[in-house]
């Protein structure tokens, strides 16, 4: 159960980052005031996702050793890489994919899952 919650923390954190990027894109398409930016739906959704992830993370820290849980957050780097390719059509190099593979292996080793 805790590992599923840890995956959810990663997904919420990654979603928050993707929503922030979408907020910036929407501001570039249609210039707006600082107040409009502050209350944009994309930014609000980002705050909700990141805030929910933080609360769930605090809950998990009560149940898992930090030395096991924290390395798993590095999976966020891989999720953002995949999301940036899928949702924003960013170009990802061969070296980036190799790095993502190394991150996954490292996170699993540090988290005691391999």
Swiss-Prot record:
Identify one Gene Ontology CC term for this UniProt entry.
plasma membrane
- Keyword Isomerase among record annotations: no
Q: Which Gene3D superfamilies match?
A: 1.10.3730.20
Per UniProt, what is the membrane topology? Answer: Multi-pass membrane protein
Keywords in UniProt for this one? Cell inner membrane, Cell membrane, Lipid A biosynthesis, Lipid biosynthesis, Lipid metabolism, Lipopolysaccharide biosynthesis, Membrane, Transmembrane, Transmembrane helix, Transport
The keyword Nucleotide-binding is annotated on this UniProt entry: no
Task: Quote the subcellular location field of this record.
Answer: Cell inner membrane
SUPFAM superfamilies recorded: Multidrug resistance efflux transporter EmrE
Subunit info here reads: Heterodimer of ArnE and ArnF.
Q: Which family does it belong to?
A: Belongs to the ArnE family.
Q: What is this protein called?
A: Probable 4-amino-4-deoxy-L-arabinose-phosphoundecaprenol flippase subunit ArnE
Task: Name its species.
Answer: Aeromonas salmonicida (strain A449)
Taxonomic lineage from the root: Bacteria, Pseudomonadati, Pseudomonadota, Gammaproteobacteria, Aeromonadales
